[in-house]
Amino acid sequence: LYIVEYAGWDTQSKIGKGYSSGSSAISSGGTDVMTYHTGRAYGTDGATAVQYRHIENPWGNVFDWVDGVNFNGSTVYVCTDPAKYADDTSDGYTNAGTRASSSGYISALGASTTAPWAIYPSSAGGSETTYIPDYSWTSSGWLGLAVGGDWDGGSFAGLFYFNGNNSSSNSNSNIGARHLFLLHILRRVSHTTWWKFSQQDAA
C-alpha cells in the first residue's frame, strides 16, 4: 500500500527518518496528537517518532520480530500457520528461495515461486540513495527476522529494513514485537456475547 501511495521506496525521505539517531528506546504515544495519521512528530527529524496509517514507529525506535520467517544461511523459510511457528527449523515451513548472500543496502527483491506473496532482499549492492535505500543484514546458521530498524539505525532504517542476522534467542533491548489480535477470536467472543444476551432476552 505504501508503494502505491508514495511511488517510491525511500520511506525516510517521504515520511520521516523515524527515531533512528537516539541512544535508547522512547515510549510509545509520540504521534498521538497528530491530526492525520501519517507523518512524523514535531521536532528534529531522526529524533522523533513517525506514524504510517495509525501505526507508530514502523521503522526506528526498536526492531520488530517477525514470526513465521526463518533463515538457514541464505535460504528463506516461511510459514503462515501460527500453530506451526517455531524457531531454527524448516519443519512446517515452505522453502521460499534464496536471499542476498551478503549484507548491504538492498538493490533487488526476490519473489518466491512457492510463496508468491513473500518478497525478500535478493541482492545487496545499493546505497542509501539508490534502489531500495534500506539495509539488509545476513549471516550463516539459523536466524530470525527483525524489521524496521532501531533507535540508532540511522540511514539503515526504513519500512524495508531486513535484519536477518539475529539468533532466535536474541533478547536485546533494541528488539521488540508487534502484538497480533486474531480477528476470528473477536468473532467468537462477539458471537458468544450475542448468544448469551439473546438467551437472557428469551428468558
Sequence positions of predicted segments:
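Long, hydrophobic, well-ordered secondary-structure blocks that form the structural core
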Residues: 1-23
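C-terminal, surface-exposed recognition/capping segments
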Residues: 17-36, 41-42, 49, 58-71, ...
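A short, polar/charged loop-to-alpha-helix boundary motif
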Residues: 72-82
